[in-house]
């Protein structure tokens, strides 16, 4: 199996991902979705966690070999980022969604120097808005953000457009297309469910029509 398939299988097995094409979830954005993902659960499963962290390390070495500092998004990217930085013997920082309203008012915790080549770790990409805010915060502090690496992406067109607009490279360990294929093979969904899941990827507004 490839890394993308292995991670997709594990996410399904540990119930970090739920697929309910017939009874969709409602996201915070209001979108009705056949999938719900909580990758924080991966931290509770050592084998899955190790698979993911090793995948991150190999992916970063291949895609961003010049990296000098790892940063995690608060809060989901922090534990993964800290483990990765430790494995790669690199400095670590984390980026808040907004500056603290007390003390020094920091948005980035940890020491980041001007021009330092940074890779930002995220657990899940939906539209990409929150992690791209983190990228912008790091750039304001003078970091040279090489790109974002995430565990999983829904592959939504809006995310692709947002990353292209921001001129930020995105690499993920697994993705929606791989996951629904694995889900069908392993019996998590039937043929009708697979059809609905494919329609969701094509159009998040009309997939139920």
Swiss-Prot record:
Cofactor(s), names only, from the UniProt record: Mg(2+)
Entry EC no(s): 2.4.2.10
Gene3D superfamilies on file: 3.40.50.2020
InterPro entries for this protein: OPRT (IPR023031), Or_phspho_trans_dom (IPR004467), PRibTrfase_dom (IPR000836), PRTase-like (IPR029057)
GO BP term, pick one: pyrimidine nucleobase biosynthetic process
Catalysed reactions, as listed in the record: orotidine 5'-phosphate + diphosphate = orotate + 5-phospho-alpha-D-ribose 1-diphosphate
Pathway: Pyrimidine metabolism; UMP biosynthesis via de novo pathway; UMP from orotate: step 1/2
Residues involved in 5-phospho-alpha-D-ribose 1-diphosphate binding: 96, 100, 102, 122-130
Binding site for orotate: 126
UniProt GO molecular function: magnesium ion binding; orotate phosphoribosyltransferase activity
Keywords annotated in UniProt: Glycosyltransferase, Magnesium, Pyrimidine biosynthesis, Transferase
Top-level taxon: Bacteria
Ribonucleoprotein listed as a keyword: no
Keyword Magnesium: yes
Role this protein plays: Catalyzes the transfer of a ribosyl phosphate group from 5-phosphoribose 1-diphosphate to orotate, leading to the formation of orotidine monophosphate (OMP).
Entry-linked NCBIfam families: pyrE
PANTHER family, A to Z: OROTATE PHOSPHORIBOSYLTRANSFERASE (PTHR19278), URIDINE 5'-MONOPHOSPHATE SYNTHASE (PTHR19278:SF9)
Family: Belongs to the purine/pyrimidine phosphoribosyltransferase family. PyrE subfamily.
Assembly and interaction partners: Homodimer.
Protein name: Orotate phosphoribosyltransferase
């Amino acid at each position: 199996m490839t890394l993308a398939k292995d991670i997709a299988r594990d996410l399904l097995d540990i119930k970090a991902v739920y697929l309910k094409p017939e009874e969709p979830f409602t996201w915070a954005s209001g979108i009705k979705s056949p999938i719900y993902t909580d990758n924080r659960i991966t931290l509770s499963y050592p084998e899955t966690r190790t698979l993911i962290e090793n995948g991150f390390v190999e992916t970063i070495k291949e895609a961003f070999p010049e990296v000098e500092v790892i940063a995690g998004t608060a809060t989901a990217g922090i534990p993964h980022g800290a483990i990765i930085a430790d494995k790669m013997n690199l400095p670590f920082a984390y980026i808040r969604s907004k500056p603290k309203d007390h003390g020094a008012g920091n948005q980035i915790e940890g020491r980041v120097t001007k021009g330092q080549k940074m890779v930002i770790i995220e657990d899940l990409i939906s539209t990409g808005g929150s992690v791209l805010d983190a990228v912008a915060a790091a750039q304001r502090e003078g970091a040279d953000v090489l790109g974002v690496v995430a565990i999983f992406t829904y592959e939504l067109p809006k995310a692709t457009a947002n990353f292209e607009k921001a001129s930020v490279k995105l690499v993920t360990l697994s993705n929606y297309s791989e996951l629904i294929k694995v889900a069908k093979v392993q019996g998590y969904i039937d043929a009708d469910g697979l059809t609905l899941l494919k329609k969701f990827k094509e159009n998040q507004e009309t997939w139920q029509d």
